[in-house]
Amino acid sequence: QFTDVKCTVTKQCWPVCKKMFGRPNGKCMNGKCRCYS
């Protein structure tokens, strides 16, 4: 799942993915967080 959350490093996305989708799996791609379910 793509989000509109800006990021510079992957670890910034883990709490975002955890909060939005219930799992912390994800990474920073093209300056935005992308989450995996």
UniProtKB/Swiss-Prot annotation:
A Pfam family matched in the record: Toxin_2
Main location: secreted
Annotated positions for site Aromatic residue of the functional dyad: Y36
Keyword Lipid metabolism assigned: no
Disulfide bond sites: C7-C28, C13-C33, C17-C35
GO MF annotations in UniProt: ion channel inhibitor activity; potassium channel regulator activity; toxin activity
Family of the protein in this entry: Belongs to the short scorpion toxin superfamily. Potassium channel inhibitor family. Alpha-KTx 01 subfamily.
Domain free text: Has the structural arrangement of an alpha-helix connected to antiparallel beta-sheets by disulfide bonds (CS-alpha/beta).
Protein name stated in the entry: Potassium channel toxin alpha-KTx 1.17
